[in-house]
Amino acid sequence: MKLIFGCDPAAFHFYKRLVAAMKKEGYEIEDVGCTSSEEPDGGKFAEIAEAVAEKVISGEGDYGFLMCGTGQGMAMAANKVPGIRAVLCYDVLPAVLSKNDNNGNILCTGAWMMEKQGIEFTMSMIKAWLFSSYTGTHEDGMAALKRLDDKKYEVR
């Protein structure tokens, strides 16, 4: 399983420790950024989210993981890419349910929240999400999301 990971400057230090711990356990991770906590953000979260989303949609990676300060910006940006179902979670049960029920393909979270829980807890949430499976019980909902992906809206 190949994972595509990304973060913005707000999450950099915690994220890098998390990636190192995941790699030490044998996970194949492509890290698409960022490169420093000193980078000016200026929308960096959106660029990183798009890069991860594109790699997931293209099949270059099986799943994505995004982290910023809260996870909110990353989830919003990733969900702009058609076909992406980015989910925002801070705990194991919502992470599992987001895969079981909603077939999430990118997990987002916030470093500011997860630092308090620690690396091990964050890894347990990611692993629980990765090894959960879509149950197929919400096919109507998945079809509705696909229609939204295909629909064009006029921005006012």
What are these regions (language model features)?
Residues K2-H13, V92-R156:
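C-terminal binding/interaction regions
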Residues G6, E30-G33, G64-C68:
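Short, conserved beta-strand edge motifs with alternating hydrophobic and charged residues
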Residues H13-E25:
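Short, solvent-exposed amphipathic alpha-helices that sit
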Residues E25, V81-P82, N102:
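Short, structured coil segments at secondary-structure junctions
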Residues E28-D41:
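A short beta-strand-loop structural module common to alpha/beta enzyme folds
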Residues P40-E50:
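Structural motif
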Residues I48-L88:
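Helix-adjacent hinge/juxtasegments
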